[in-house]
Amino acid sequence: MKTQRDGHSLGRWSLVLLLLGLVMPLAIIAQVLSYKEAVLRAIDGINQRSSDANLYRLLDLDPRPTMDGDPDTPKPVSFTVKETVCPRTTQQSPEDCDFKKDGLVKRCMGTVTLNQARGSFDISCDKDNKRFALLGDFFRKSKEKIGKEFKRIVQRIKDFLRNLVPRTES
């Protein structure tokens, strides 16, 4: 025979299961990293694999591309890191380190997943060689100056030729 006590017990279990059902999706959502958190995790991996003396820290994060909602699908990322003053052997977070004056800058591209439990990344970084950028600026400015000078020379030749043509007196 069923007692009132059994009814309360069944009601409690139902309530526990209902609450558990409501909390589980929140736990799953909490395991999804934000775009920036996934990039910071990738930078931690870059620092672990690096043979450079100092840690790198996020300098610039390109805007987040439009993405699907699946946290297991690799998402494209691109960002720039800069060398900090903290040695790689330190246990300090790169975010707590100051950038090194004239520190090495690297441009990084690849993919990250936002699933915290199975988070992965495939990132490659190249030195952001400012010398080549400066060389490009030099050639662009030189081209502009040469173009202006060329136009000036052409105008002087035209003026000279106009003056050579015999003038008729009226």
Curated annotation (Swiss-Prot):
MF term (GO), any: lipopolysaccharide binding
Official protein name in the record: Cathelicidin antimicrobial peptide
Taken from the UniProt entry, a GO cellular component term is:
extracellular region
What does the UniProt entry say about where the protein is found?
Secreted; Vesicle
Keyword terms: Antibiotic, Antimicrobial, Cleavage on pair of basic residues, Disulfide bond, Immunity, Innate immunity, Pharmaceutical, Secreted, Signal
Query: What's the reported outcome of changing residue 157 to A?
Result: Loss of antimicrobial activity against M.luteus
Pro-peptide positions on chain: 31-131
Gene symbol of the encoding locus: CAMP
Which cysteines does the record link by disulfide bonds?
86-97, 108-125
Q: Where is this region: Active core?
A: 150-162
Q: Which GO terms describe its biological process?
A: amyloid fibril formation; antibacterial humoral response; antimicrobial humoral immune response mediated by antimicrobial peptide; cellular response to interleukin-1; cellular response to interleukin-6; cellular response to lipopolysaccharide; cellular response to peptidoglycan; cellular response to tumor necrosis factor
Question: What tissues harbor this protein?
Answer: Expressed in neutrophilic granulocytes (at protein level). Expressed in bone marrow.
Q: Where is the signal peptide?
A: 1-30
Fill in the domain comment.
The cathelin-like domain (CLD), which is the propeptide part, does not seem to exhibit auto-inhibitory function, as it does not inhibit the antibacterial activity of antibacterial peptide LL-37.
